Amino acid sequence: MVEYVVSLDKLGVHDVEHVGGKNASLGEMISNLAGAGVSVPGGFATTAQAYRDFLEQSGLNDRIHAALDALDVDDVNALAKTGAQIRQWVMEAEFPARLDSEIRQAFAALANGNDNLAVAVRSSATAEDLPDASFAGQQETFLNIRGVDNVIRAAKEVFASLFNDRAIAYRVHQGFDHKLVALSAGVQRMVRSETGTAGVMFTLDTESGFRDVVFITGAYGLGETVVQGAVNPDEFYVHKPTLEAGRPAILRRNLGSKAIKMIYGDEAKAGRSVKVVDVDRADRARFALSDAEVTELAKQAMIIEKHYGRPMDIEWAKDGDDGKLYIVQARPETVKSRASATVMERYLLKEKGTVLVEGRAIGQRIGAGPVKVINDVSEMDKVQPGDVLVSDMTDPDWEPVMKRASAIVTNRGGRTCHAAIIARELGIPAVVGCGNATQILQDGQGVTVSCAEGDTGFIFEGELGFDVRKNSVDAMPDLPFKIMMNVGNPDRAFDFAQLPNEGVGLARLEFIINRMIGVHPKALLNFAGLPADIKESVEKRIAGYPDPVGFYVEKLVEGISTLAAAFWPKKVIVRLSDFKSNEYANLIGGKLYEPEEENPMLGFRGASRYISESFRDCFELECRALKKVRNEMGLTNVEIMVPFVRTLGEASQVVELLAGNGLKRGENGLKVIMMCELPSNALLADEFLEFFDGFSIGSNDLTQLTLGLDRDSGIVAHLFDERNPAVKKLLANAIAACNKAGKYIGICGQGPSDHPDLARWLMEQGIESVSLNPDSVLDTWFFLAEGQDQA
């Protein structure tokens, strides 16, 4: 006789057809990974045979399939009516006596005398969680169910949920035969995360598909709020190779608003067993996980990924009573892990518009169309093909119409919620967690939704033009020098790392300071003495971090380490901050500390600033961050570049200052490069090279200073050309000096990106690397290869 109920510890991946993907996976982890440190709560599962016999013995099979055969799933109203009818039939039917009895016996064994045991009752479909089909969230989950009668009712609710509107539509669209899909109910001991935290993690970056990170989201209370997208969670990125090396490996921390949490309700039966409450303001301003917990979760994720041999989508929970971290689900990631690695598809806006709303970007595409604000699932049928669907949050029930939309925008949700997962699967751009999109965007208004700018997604006014470029990158032609990239935005690092490249020739700190920090370092050093209004602004920025100075250093560490990890083990040359005084003044508190200069471009910047008494303590914070990235995290692919070194005296002083702050040339393989961007640098190249390990040519400033041009002046802008003979003479001098000394020589200015013929000339001069803007890498690479063939 076939069993109707099986203990989870008796199951493994080979049991998908008996208990569905979810329950088979839980059994696999309990059986094989407990010894490796993966904690999974115990429980039992009903079998697919139990489900089939229930439908057969109750006479439901023929009625259900007759109703489905007559249904057009694209008719949203008919779908809702048929789905509701079938679910009602299932709930009204009685379980076979043997199934009822076996559930009672299994629950008694699990409870072991604890009459008040709380369990989760989850669905597990036999076609769910297969490597090439994501049924994420299509069937129901019931949390905090107590008492065996409530468990049996919840199991029946789970069976009925196979006929949710979204599940019916999804099976039709994916070509799954309704008759071949069966359901198993998993009953699992609850992790007490209502007093702890919970969330989702992926063993790759969900947007770019970058494989060397674990991406973790978390919020307070039960994990359903994160999965549903009802809350904007905290986010963390952990670098796998660094973690495997036993070093601190957290690359990024993004503080989410975490406004609500789901906790146990007053009743213990399906539908009333949980409730949502507000989170205290103080808890919102803290990260829901400690660094140690983030690291522990990442380790468990890597163990699971290694066991399954593929990228995984994992749900986790922290028990508020015992403080332990548990894995409550694991399934194969089904979108990015199947994407082609040999064809790069890039979306590029042709024009910029007014930004109306912004949030978290899902995918890397662009969509445009008229806004359709949907406040309730009953309004779903209003969405027409090409509309931009705007809502507070999307429920998986909305899936039947989501595929009609050109883009999706929500007030709430993070990158691992259902809306995000489904949008990725459908290839539709989505911006989630916008906060107020439903108030700002108006029905019928034309907008453009762009997820092609990095972590932040933008909704622009008007339907803007955009291009889609596809390039094959599986076999790039050889060149006699390295093509590197100029990258400033850590949000784009994992994405840009997918392009053919030899590393980063210019990583700018300015973007990190501007976007991720936004506060003048002096204001953080002098926090106690700040005026009240500035202090309040700073306090909002530093939420989640222990102190103002620690915030500055850690944010620099996060930005630099993300860039270094994305391209590891390739070289990443990080340029020390090169803000001018007017740019520093624009940071919070900046006007208190910056001089007013007539021409900041030629003023207090670069090495002069670092060695000055007024800025040296700020510069030392940059040194602390770089030292942590290289020496503690072990990301020794980071090299340092010093900009705007006017004299040999400055060169000597700045190298000495770096060494005094633990960044000594040659120590732990450290190379210190000088940005060759003043005529004095090229004219005295041999002398400057005594202090540095090479040059990176900054062609923008070198051209400006050689030709006596203000590059910000429109009047003389037409004379600005890096190919001017005087500029090329200085370039040739710098290249020859570095080659003679056997030291690094590259170029990171705008010139080669704008003028591929200049890149070809540099190649002929014997330059070691050309660092380009990411959007010109492929075109320039192919142009140079063709020129080489013709030569």
Swiss-Prot record:
* Alphabetical list of InterPro entries matching this protein: ATP_grasp_subdomain_1, PEP-util_enz_mobile_dom, PEP_synth, PEP_util_AS, PEP_util_C, PEP_util_CS, Phosphohistidine_dom_sf, PPDK_AMP/ATP-bd
Modified sites of kind Phosphothreonine: T416
Single Gene Ontology BP annotation: gluconeogenesis
The record's listing under Gene3D superfamilies reads:
ATP-grasp fold, A domain, ATP-grasp fold, B domain, Phosphoenolpyruvate-binding domains, Phosphohistidine domain
Indicate the enzyme's highest-level EC class.
Answer: transferase
The entry's active site is H418, C748
Cofactor(s) the protein needs? Mg(2+)
Q: Which EC number(s) does UniProt give?
A: 2.7.9.2
Q: Which SUPFAM superfamilies match?
A: Glutathione synthetase ATP-binding domain-like, Phosphoenolpyruvate/pyruvate domain, Phosphohistidine domain
Chain residues that bind substrate = R508, R575, E677, G698, S699, N700, D701
Alphabetized UniProt keyword annotations: ATP-binding, Kinase, Magnesium, Metal-binding, Nucleotide-binding, Phosphoprotein, Pyruvate, Transferase
The catalytic activity, as recorded, is: pyruvate + ATP + H2O = phosphoenolpyruvate + AMP + phosphate + 2 H(+)
Q: Name one GO molecular function term.
A: metal ion binding
Identify the pathway: Carbohydrate biosynthesis; gluconeogenesis
Q: Where does Mg(2+) bind?
A: E677, D701
What are the Phosphotyrosine sites (modified residues) in this protein?
Y744
What remark does the entry add?
The reaction takes place in three steps, mediated by a phosphocarrier histidine residue located on the surface of the central domain. The two first partial reactions are catalyzed at an active site located on the N-terminal domain, and the third partial reaction is catalyzed at an active site located on the C-terminal domain. For catalytic turnover, the central domain swivels from the concave surface of the N-terminal domain to that of the C-terminal domain.
**Record-stated family:** Belongs to the PEP-utilizing enzyme family.
Query: What does the UniProt record say this protein does?
Result: Catalyzes the phosphorylation of pyruvate to phosphoenolpyruvate.
In Swiss-Prot or TrEMBL terms, this protein is called Phosphoenolpyruvate synthase
Naturally occurring in which organism (per UniProt): Pseudomonas aeruginosa (strain UCBPP-PA14)
Q: What is the gene called?
A: ppsA
